[in-house]
Amino acid sequence: MSVRHRVSLFALVVLLPLAQAAFAQTPTIDYVVSAPQPEQRWLQVDVRFPARAGTPLDVRMARSSPGRYATHEFGKNVYLFEARGAGEAVLPVEQVAPAHWRVTPTDGVVRVRYRLFADHIDGTYSAVDGTHAHLNAPATFVWAPALPETPITVRFVQPPGRNWRVSTQLFPTDDPLAFTAPNLQYLMDSPVEFSAHAVREFTVAYPGGGTPARIRLAVHHLGTEAQLDAYAAMVETIVREQAAIFGTLPTFDGGTYTFLMDYLPWADGDGMEHRNSTVCTAAASLADGMARVAGTASHEFFHAWNVERIRPASLEPFDFSQANMSGELWLAEGFTSYYGSLAMIRAGIVAQDRGVAQLAMFAGAVMRAPGAQFRSAVDMSRLAPYVDAAQAVDPTNWENTYVSYYTYGAAIGLGLDLTLRERSGGTVTLDDYMRTLWKTHGVPGGKAPGYVSRPYTLKDAEAALATVSGDAAFAADFFRRHVLGTEPLPFRRLFAAAGYTLRERETPPTLGTLGLTAQQGRMVVTNNTVATSAVYKAGVGRGDTILSLNGTAVTQAGDWERILSTLTPGTEVELAFESRGEKKTARVTVQSNDRVEAIPMAERTPQQEALRAAWLASRVK
């Protein structure tokens, strides 16, 4: 047999099966993230996409992010974008749109490389510097719309001279710097902290037994080990208190939930929920007040149930190419705000009366906001693409036409909780409502990590209330008046049922918030005046100049407040101002501040005591 024949036989016997095995393997999308010069705030991202020779492959940068509802042009920070095939030959790249590239491969691979400028530490964006890489996936990774279910690998490269660790909800491998995601939805929902951060962890058992859930805190901060120990213990009380509301923790993918926390002077304050993790950032340190930053952790952890698994159909699956509008954010975000605060009270981190005073701020904001008469909670939710960290150059009138769906929804959650307790004698609560949503829409899970099989609609949310209350007419009426409509809840009566008086706060006299700023020797109004204020009724608007109040000139910072402090609510005074070049005067009536507060009643009935205790006491057994 000749050598040529022997080689051919080898090829048939050995190489062909290997080739067939390689062909049979599921193709993957492979990312490599490196930071050769982290101090200069840029990352290098290399991606290998499987492709078909001759078939164009579209590659995009996301324009929205899970947990955010506005458009965010992440592509603006991408540069030096290039593509190659399996070899080193550069492939032509057609830029179809600002964050949309098209590459036609000559073989079965498209390899993309680009640089990403990243210098904003919060939940939405990405950041890299000499101390860490803090990554939100949609702000970091390009993706191929044609490959939504292709498995993914992500590998991180240590920056020069560093020995960082990676914390993320991505699935680990034997390599501590390499991870996987089963699909695009899961990748884009998986933030990363790559730094020399500290880690604390604890476990929480499931009622039915099995492997306990592992809860990790990955904390990049400048504090002490003792401070972190104390903070981890505080977060543990929150986690256990929230688990008691539902009776169980969610089944986390991989068995672990991770708090990714950056408490650094150069960070922005933020929180962003994800399926098996959350990002919490603040410029505050643990020494500045743990309860303050723990409030964000409480809100975000409640999202592990509410929004991540009890998920609006309007957000499932998430569309990374545009803003995702949802009419359910009053429930997804607003009820989470309510329970984030309530859990802090039940866990004993915030004193009960102080905590109720904070909850009353939700009610007060909706009671006094002009915008609440124009739009329902559903309407406010649908405005999120315009307001959720969205940017606008032209002025808006949100002061008079908008109430945050966080606040509006929290007020509805508060009012519904007290309503259910009052009408049932304490046998039915909002906890029961959340458990019903959980069993119906959360427990069924999804076809794969990153998906939810039974997302809910507004009709589903109403049906759950009918089930819990045992009264479909009540549920329909509540939704018609307070969710789809703009009728306010009877908060004074509801707080009284729990032994609290809701009243106007005693505050300094006011004519309305002006936001005065000195500009070229003139005191200029820099914000829209609020429709319920005296200055609004007088015709004062943004850009106008205040000349005098009650006969005294207003020429520098502090003059306005100083003059107001000498006046009495109910008094009528003269206001002089200039609007669009025209000098005007108006008679205005001094007002008291329109904020409300909850004051514990000195004497409470047994019924009030029972409702208050059941509402605010710990559920942990």
Question: What kind of region is each of these model predictions?
Answer:
Residues 74-83, 117, 149-167, 171, ...:
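Zn2+-dependent metallopeptidase catalytic core
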Residues 340-341, 350-621:
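C-terminal recognition in membrane/secretory proteostasis and scaffolding
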Residues 42-75, 139-159, 166:
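Surface-exposed beta-strand/loop patches in extracellular or lumenal glycoproteins
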Residues 113-200:
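Extended, low-hydrophobicity, Ser/Thr/Pro/Gly-biased non-transmembrane segments
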Residues 35-36, 67-129, 144:
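A surface-exposed beta-strand-loop module
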Residues 278, 285, 309-310, 321-374:
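Post-HExxH zinc-binding segment in Zn-dependent metallohydrolases
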Residues 45-51, 61-63, 99-130, 152-160, ...:
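Short, hydrophobic/aromatic-enriched beta-strand segments in well-ordered soluble domains
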